[in-house]
Amino acid sequence: MVKRGKKTKYLFVTGGVVSSLGKGLSAASIGALLENRGLEVQHLKLDPYINVDPGTMSPFQHGEVFVTDDGAETDLDLGHYERFTSAKMTRRNNYTTGRIYQNVIQRERRGEYLGKTVQVIPHITDEIKAVIREAAGGADILIVEVGGTVGDIESLPFLEAIRQMKYDVGEENAVYAHLTLVPFIAAAGELKTKPTQHSVKELREIGIQPDLLLCRSDREIPRDMKDKIALFCNVDPSAVFTALDVPSIYEVPLSLHREGLDDKLAELFNIWSRAPRLERWETIVDKVKNPRRGEVRIGIVGKYVELHESYKSLNEALVHGGIANDARVKLAFIDSTKLEEGDLSDLDKVDAILVPGGFGIRGTEGKILGVKYAREHKVPFFGICLGLQMAVIEMARNVLGLAGANSLEFDEQTPHPVVTLMEGQKGVTDKGGTMRLGAYPCALKEGTKARALYGADLVHERHRHRFEFNNDYRAQFEAAGMVFSGVNPDLGLVEMIELPGQHFVGCQFHPEFRSKPFAPHPLFAGFVKAALEHRDAQQRQPSAEVKKLPVGKNG
């Protein structure tokens, strides 16, 4: 094999049969394997929907919006890419059909096409190829994930563009990986390959012959069945891999490595690389599977609890907090709208309470009840973005005695707008891409819990909001005991709050976007630690039943 040069090689990941097979995790895991072989890896996600970005889409439809340092609102798969590799995502790492068409139409309006009829081929496909090359950024390998399912009409321009790329860059500089489903039919008692055969047939009709197949299955696919898939799909038998269901997503790179996927990619790319070093991944998986400090229950009080993908980065950041404390974090999703009905029993069953970000008035009173419960019962509390604002409103009403206190987002007539619209947001009418987005500095106050957790005076965190704490009320809150432990040094905006005497922390930013399994975010590590301490303290206390036992003669 030749030693790798500076020319970028491209791996295109497509999916077939059904959606939600795990293309993003597969792409991220491949990135982790290649990076651990000493290669520089970058990622690109191509989404076929017409929205310019996912920023205005419902979490129920799209899942989480992942925010990058440069303020891009992107697909949640970019979170997987950042968590699994050292690559830093920016707005150039996620393109949608809407954004591609927007670029082309703007060029047409500027007259850059010199009077030509602008068409899908070549103009749209050329634009797609241009953003693919731009995303590479000089990396050894660019992994391009094409969203959607092969056969969807929306994906066709992207598939045509990646078909052309192999001819543009050369055979050994472009590899096609196709993720399919090999289901086990319980009634027949066997795995079925027909869905995979049909999916590959559809891909080949478009003009793309996959170089390797990742076959998602809940069990190992035997060698003879892999040979059958290879025969009918015109793929080398050594290029058919089981993408096995595993208990933890952090086991996926190890599972694919055991299948020999990274060796095959090195062969297909004809690229030199060292032997993979996966000890860190093995350690992480061991900590996830065999925590020495047992299990801790974290209650997430939100309104998107039916779809856990809505809080993807948050969920993983809590897992990372568990890794940092050698504990397993069990998430209990608590519907805030149900709390409004008066049943708070779910809050009794958790060791800590977290109120995440969100938008809109629905469920906010339930979140405020969750905050009140945590404050009054000394249960560790962590409020993120809207969660901080809920904590402020709860304290204003129940400690400061400011009746009717609220956020201007929910009540424009509130007598006490303790949460107000940011100055820079006044007059903004467009919804897409207009919030306070991206990384901003936060100066931490000496002697606070926030300063102790971070171990730094100044940090940078990612934001996604329009509303902020109203500094007109700051003196009243400080007099009541609230500590403003983090402030934006440029604008004086409140970034962090806390209450002394308990683990009660709120932040206006989204720390979950910066957490990784190998580098758990300090706020999540500290939160899980506090939850463990609360759990242990509760277990040491005698139960109510024991307290009621009659005292004996020797008592």
UniProtKB/Swiss-Prot annotation:
Residues 297-537 form the Glutamine amidotransferase type-1 domain. Allosterically activated by GTP, when glutamine is the substrate; GTP has no effect on the reaction when ammonia is the substrate. The allosteric effector GTP functions by stabilizing the protein conformation that binds the tetrahedral intermediate(s) formed during glutamine hydrolysis. Inhibited by the product CTP, via allosteric rather than competitive inhibition. GO terms for biological process: 'de novo' CTP biosynthetic process; pyrimidine nucleobase biosynthetic process. L-glutamine binds at G358, L386, G387, L388, Q389, E409, R466. It comes from the Bacteria. ATP binds at S20, L21, G22, K23, G24, L25, D77. Residues 536-555 are annotated as: Disordered. Its EC number is 6.3.4.2. CTP binds at S19, D152, I153, E154, K192, T193, K194, P195, T196, Q197, K228. It catalyses: UTP + L-glutamine + ATP + H2O = CTP + L-glutamate + ADP + phosphate + 2 H(+); L-glutamine + H2O = L-glutamate + NH4(+); UTP + NH4(+) + ATP = CTP + ADP + phosphate + 2 H(+). The active site is at C385 (nucleophile), H510, E512. Mg(2+) binds at D77, E145. Keywords: ATP-binding, Glutamine amidotransferase, Ligase, Magnesium, Metal-binding, Nucleotide-binding, Pyrimidine biosynthesis. Residues 1-271 are annotated as: Amidoligase domain. GO terms for molecular function: ATP binding; CTP synthase activity; glutaminase activity; identical protein binding; metal ion binding. Coiled coil: none annotated. One of its GO terms (cellular component) is cytosol. CTPSs have evolved a hybrid strategy for distinguishing between UTP and CTP. The overlapping regions of the product feedback inhibitory and substrate sites recognize a common feature in both compounds, the triphosphate moiety. To differentiate isosteric substrate and product pyrimidine rings, an additional pocket far from the expected kinase/ligase catalytic site, specifically recognizes the cytosine and ribose portions of the product inhibitor. HAMAP family: PyrG (MF_01227). Belongs to the CTP synthase family. Catalyzes the ATP-dependent amination of UTP to CTP with either L-glutamine or ammonia as the source of nitrogen. Regulates intracellular CTP levels through interactions with the four ribonucleotide triphosphates. Homotetramer. This is CTP synthase.
